[in-house]
Amino acid sequence: MQAYEERGVAETDMVRPRPLMRRSIPRDARSLAPSDNRLADFAPPHSSREHGAKLGARSTAVTRKAGHPVKVRNSIALVTGANRGLGRVFCHGFLQNGAAKVYAAARDPGQIHMSGVVPIRLDVTSISDVLEAADVCRDVTILVNNAGVLRDSAMLGEGSEEAARQEMETNFFGPLSIVQRFAPVLAANGGGAIVNILSVASWFTNPSMATYCASKAAAQVLTDAIRMQLRNKGTRVIGVYAGYIDTDMASHVNTRKTAPMQVVERTLAALESGMDRVFADDRATYIDQRVRADPEAFYAELQKHWDATR
């Protein structure tokens, strides 16, 4: 969970990025489904005008101003986990907004069926794959660490250690290894940007998916650390936060989900607007405000949900 200063929600320094409008891309319109007992229980109450007014003053695309703009047009992007889900949509988003080249990385490049991309083999947990990718893709200017895994495991119980190790290897050590090898590549190409796909689970511990929360909290620390370490190299580091995204990874969850293209649009807009933190949906905005405003009350509600379902 992130360490936050003791301050009121109204004191946050947030602004909205200007969206890219080069091409009009339709977004999914989903009806609300019954909530499950994980992150869904902490979605903003859309039926409440009071909450809507409080959150409406700040866009669901909440971000924090930080660095220099990085242009998407004519960029050369590398996206991990690009064979499906959010990674695949990121590849399309880069191409549609004028990227000169997009490396679509996956464990099995044979699963990548997109025109206009350069498929490459990259298992983020394989050092040899990472080294080879860094050697081949020497022209990259934007790196998107998107590959991830979710096991939905409590911290204690059968299989929890295996789940924790798998999630840490993919969600933390994978991006760390990739950044370690690609930071010099980005610096040699003018600095560019690193985009880490995080989660609202980076900010708090939900006991029903605690091992995942631990891996995303570690990825949050990684993001903050490399942002400071690479700033003088001219490399922007952006963290992207969302609740459940409508992909295969969250197919088992019966709740309202965010369209992948919405996440991509807001991320690309943040690149061009000089932002270092992107809230990709309402749930990210809502949970961020609740955790910082009254963490004790937030965790009391989590405990209540946990006790009621056990």
Model-derived segments and their meaning:
Residues 83, 91:
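N-terminal Rossmann NAD(P)H-binding glycine-rich loop of SDR-like oxidoreductase domains
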Residues 95-113:
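Conserved glycine-rich Rossmann-like NAD(P)H-binding loop of the short-chain dehydrogenase/reductase
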Residues 115-128:
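Rossmann-fold cofactor-recognition segment
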Residues 150-165, 208-211:
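Conserved mid-core segment of classical short-chain dehydrogenase/reductases
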Residues 179, 215:
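Active-site helix of classical SDR
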Residues 199:
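Residue(s) in the substrate-gating loop at a strand-loop-helix junction
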Residues 256-257, 261-310:
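C-terminal tail/cap regions
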